[in-house]
Amino acid sequence: MEIASNKGVIADASTPAGRAGMSESEWREAIKFDSTDTGWVIMSIGMAIGAGIVFLPVQVGLMGLWVFLLSSVIGYPAMYLFQRLFINTLAESPECKDYPSVISGYLGKNWGILLGALYFVMLVIWMFVYSTAITNDSASYLHTFGVTEGLLSDSPFYGLVLICILVAISSRGEKLLFKISTGMVLTKLLVVAALGVSMVGMWHLYNVGSLPPLGLLVKNAIITLPFTLTSILFIQTLSPMVISYRSREKSIEVARHKALRAMNIAFGILFVTVFFYAVSFTLAMGHDEAVKAYEQNISALAIAAQFISGDGAAWVKVVSVILNIFAVMTAFFGVYLGFREATQGIVMNILRRKMPAEKINENLVQRGIMIFAILLGWSAI
């Protein structure tokens, strides 16, 4: 039923506009796609396409196309529904400042700090992985291209300076982070898509292979599930994204709609690009080439160089550097946002047990988290 108000006619309560207490025109204005929406789509894609993307075709080739297809049919819808549920849970929370506070609102402070700690541990592991990767890889490339005589990573201060710069960029605010990430993420996405397209001319239907026995098919599909899921997983950015929308929007319905829309767009782009990329390589190289690539520990880029004639080797060298550095940097940004939010939630949960919330200096807490993140990343190097 529509209700009249001084703002216009409020839409039926069964519609999103009605639940937000808005007319249809107000709802359309509130949910307009803007630069913030673009930024979160970019950050989500950047988080999903990590450095490991170049090894996905090898894993798919080893297991076979039928196994990957079954794994995709199971894994991708399940992950989509889980991420959708995750967003809805966060968006509905009365207090949406960080993941532990959301859990505290549903289950109490003790569960909030327990599940928040588990979430924190997951992000700490990724902080270790990407801090180490970006330090070692960047130093290796500088040495390979003759910029430095030795490896800068041998000095502990190189890693410290690098992590300080990355944390400073990540902490400057969404707009700067979105601007820096956009070019890198679009480059990664285009490289992955281009690699898939470059293989189309070498497709052979016999690389599809025969359908394996049902038991073996299911077993291998389950084994392949982690690779399938992590190929387009970006749950680390969902919590910071929902919190950002909740802080910007007065209406929970608007914040939820925008977060779900950003997730849907990112998921759709990732699914189409990554799925095509993996299938294209499998149809081009087949199982035997995948086994050789696995034994030699080479990536999809090196495989592409073997198939592409002419200046393939030179092209691969440049693209591999760009893809690897951009993948690690944008993934670090996404992980840091989640890490900062998780750490803040745990710290605030503990402090609120000791003192009134209004006496807590949140700016001081955030600065402390920055220092902690730098020291944590540095300790992993």
Q: Where is each model-derived feature located?
A:
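Membrane-interface "cap" regions at the ends of multi-pass membrane proteins
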Residues: 1-58, 80-84
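Extracellular loop-to-transmembrane helix junctions
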Residues: 57-88, 100, 111
